[in-house]
Every structure is written in C-alpha cells, then in structure tokens.
Amino acid sequence: MKMTKRIAAMAACAVMAASSMVGMSASAGFSSTMLEPNGSYESFTVDGVNYGFQIRSEVETTTTSSGKTKANSQTYLHEVVQRKVPTSNVKVQTQLYGKSKKGGNYTLLSVGYTTIDSNTTRIYATTSWIDQYDEISSYYTTGLAEKRLSSYYSWSNLLSVNTSSIS
C-alpha cells in the first residue's frame, strides 16, 4: 500500500512535532508515556448513515529472551457513534520510529497496515522492531487513518495523527 502525498506530509509533521515534545533523558529502563490519548474525532456518512471514530496509538517495549529490546507499535480505531465503521471504508496505519543513541533525527523503522479482526471486526494496525545492536535510545509511534466516502476507491485525506513515546 502506498502512502498518499498528504499522509507523507502529515507523517513528516508528526515526526517534527514528536521530536520537539519527546524528552531525551537517559534512563535505565523504558516506560510508556501517552502524549495524546486519542486522535481528533472524525465523522463521515456512507449511504446516508453517519459514522464517527477516533484513533489511539501506543508504543511499548519488551525484552526478548536474548536480551534485545523489542518495540511494539499499535494504532486502534475506536467507534464514537454507536455503529460499527464499515471495514471497507477505513484504512489504518501505524508507523514506528526510533532515535539512535548517537543522536540525530528519528528514523522510520517499521510500518504496519490495516488488519481486521474476523471475530469482532475491530480495525487496527500493528508493527514491531527488535533493536539487534542496542542502538535505539527512544521510540515513538504515529497512527494514521483514512476514510472512503462512497463506493469509489478514492480515499479522502488523512484524518487523525496520534503520537506516543517511550524513552
């Protein structure tokens, strides 16, 4: 799946915003901090029915059995209006970024795309990254969502961006 120019621009803005918000203090362990608990509310109408949702992104780290740090990024879609958002009308993406212990900017490590739980029809995206060489000092994730307004496959612009960090 390719990102639209609008998503790419919004993702770049999210990188800059998160870079300015994330404290770079060194710590012995990782802990999760939600900078924004939910993305902005979005609504749309399909075939005369109104739907609304927000997205929530989070990043967490665990230690693998080999002692490596593994970062997990998730972005979930939450229905706001009491109707299930049609799964064919929404795409969700999660992007996991990392910053080197040597400094510099955040770098995109991994991207996860829309997954639909077949039992609950919950819409989410997930991805992970294992720090093989103990080089990453902090991580953050950005969640993106797009909606389709009609039966045509032209997707609207980016809806919500939400950032969580870990350092």
What does each model-found stretch correspond to?
Residues 67, 101, 132-136:
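A short, structured loop/turn motif at beta-sheet edges
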Residues 30-32, 41, 105-115, 155-158:
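Tryptophan-centered short beta-strand motifs
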Residues 68-78:
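Short coil/turn motif common to extracellular beta-sandwich-like domains
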Residues 110-149:
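Short, solvent-exposed, Trp/other aromatic-anchored flexible loops in extracytoplasmic proteins
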Residues 59-63, 75-77, 141-144:
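Low-complexity repeat regions of mature extracellularly deployed or surface/particle-associated proteins
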Residues 1-70:
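N-terminal prepro-regions of secreted/extracellular proteins
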Residues 152-167:
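Short beta-strand elements
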Residues 78-110:
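Extended low-complexity, serine/threonine- and proline-enriched intrinsically disordered segments
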